[in-house]
Amino acid sequence: LGKFYYKKATTGGFDRQYIKDQNQNLDDIGKDIREVDTKINDHKKAKNAHTSDQIAHSSGLTVAQEIEVEKARIRNLVLNVDGTNIKEVVDARVDRNGTIYPTLRDRLDADGKVVDDIRDDLITRISFKNALSYGADPTGKTPSADAIQSALDEIHSEGGGWLVIPGGTYLIEKRMIIYENTRVTMAADCVLLRGWAGGFFINGRPDDSFSGYSGRSNIIIEGGILDGNYANIDKYPTTAMDSIILGHANNIWIDCVTFKDTITAHAIDANGCNNLQITRSNFLGFIDLSGKRPFSEAIQLGEFVEMGVNQFGAFDGTPNQNVYIAHNHFGKSELLGGWGCGVGNHYSVYNIFQTGITLFDNDFEDCTFAGVRTFKWGEVKILNNRFKRNNECIRISQAAGGIESSKNVEGVQMNRPQNAQNVLIQGNDFYDYKSYGILSFGQIYNNEIAWSDGIRILGNYFKLKAKEVGEYDYEQAIKLVFARNAFISDNRIFGGRRGMWIEGCFNTFIDRNYVSCVDTEAIYVEKSRDKTSTVPKSYHISIDRNEINTTGRNGIFIQNCDHFDIRDNNVLNTNKEQSSTRGRGGIYVENGYDGRIENSRIRGVEKEFAILVKDAATEVNVTNTKGTGRVIVEGDSNFNGYYGTTQDDYIRKISTKSSS
């Protein structure tokens, strides 16, 4: 036990310090007593409270010495009692737990069974099959698919297992079937080289009739390189190949695989999978030999229908759900260019939705169509990815009516457009896109609208190479057509033809963005392209607290929009284009109904006006404008001022325009 220290009286009387020290001593004494009590109780319960050589015996020896003496006497008796070691054999019938077996053989059999059980358990846990043991050729001189399939078949017959393919180059002459409960591990320097017209793996047989997610599941494919062998296209001709085909499955994980030089189709064609993970893999090099598939996806996420995958299973439209795609790289190879699309789909099934899809921390480079294309996907998260040199980075598509994607699973044409909801695009970096950073289209068919609904574009970074204003081509950071309930907030946009394009949208909130150095407008509301009067204009747009610095034309351009609010925006240095035929400035309203422009700060020496509201607009008021330039409000119903009430409490206009 430790030493205990307490305070002594340091004052001459019963004063405040004395009482304080006394209370402190009482508190310390209580703690020390509890500590001693705890140590005593622990000592009583401890298995090693004392070792046997610490305890004295009545003989004068320690307990340890007494035990060793008795053990030596017993050994001597057992070994020498009759000179034949019979007693030693009898003694060996007793095991470590004190169990006495009828014969020594019974004890040996029992112990042997324990050893065998442990061995079998370890084999089950850690054993694997080596592809070389089945005849796979790591030199690539002879085909290896049959040998690898033999190993996979044996694993299947055993109810599951682990196949390892060591380093080397293996010529693959047919597609190999991976069954349920199988793990395939390829060494980092293992190359499966296409040696026929198709790809490498599939998780189904032609005679499988699985539906839903009941197919061959619990599969891991990891490591290695799946090489489409485009360098030898003449020796092994093909027009299209999928490297891996998956369907009707649950719990699939593809990790650390490199897909190289894929031809026309997909690296991974996943249809009707639940709990699909694709991580830390590389998708390098693609070519479209058909000339008809500029949209081909490295990872296709499709419903299980015949037009998507016709290899096995029921064509019941089973969607992918709960998909996690993370830490992957999509780009060029040494031989071929980038993909049409990194992750996406290009068809759908009426009333079936793919949901719960997350794309996190991926690199999409040099995609000629789009880095990511959602097609009627719901509950999507696109987070912390990097997009470089793509034509489009993210395209959000809905299904139109009157096309293949508006048929139900029975093939009946429903003739209706359809949408999914809730796409979150957050924390991504977009560099040097050729057309759009983010592009979304809803669909109108037979006067019915399928909105792109619930898009949230938050905290992203858009950056193009610096150019003089007027030198960009078609690059726009964000374009939304027929979107509803969209939130665009906290984004940073540098460069391009335009910052944001809003067209035929309902309930759009644009807040706290920074837009700099664009050729035309930072925020532009376009006329609706709809000719059916289904969505003739935009409704309910709020443009608040944005920072706009340096535009070729107007900072904010409003037209074809009812019920709009433009509040608390800073607009600087507009009209850099300096058109000789049309004046431009900070905020321009061509037409629209029921708008308000409040608390603007507008500065710059090249603008023609700070704010201009044309007479084609109605019921628009402008108030509390700070900065430089003219505030021009045309039209009888528009005014520079705010609203108050009359003596009898009716709303009325209060003009702030000076009479002088």
Regions found by a protein language model. Give the residues of each.
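Right-handed parallel beta-helix
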Residues: 214-356, 365, 469-471
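Acidic Gly/Asp/Thr-rich repetitive segments characteristic of extracellular carbohydrate-active
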Residues: 131-166
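Parallel beta-helix/beta-solenoid
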Residues: 179-182, 187, 216, 221, ...
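Intrinsically disordered, low-complexity Ser/Thr- and acidic-rich flexible linkers and loops
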Residues: 210-213, 291-293, 305-319, 348, ...
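Short glycine/acidic-rich loop motifs that flank beta-strands on beta-rich extracellular proteins
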Residues: 160, 173-175, 188, 194-198, ...
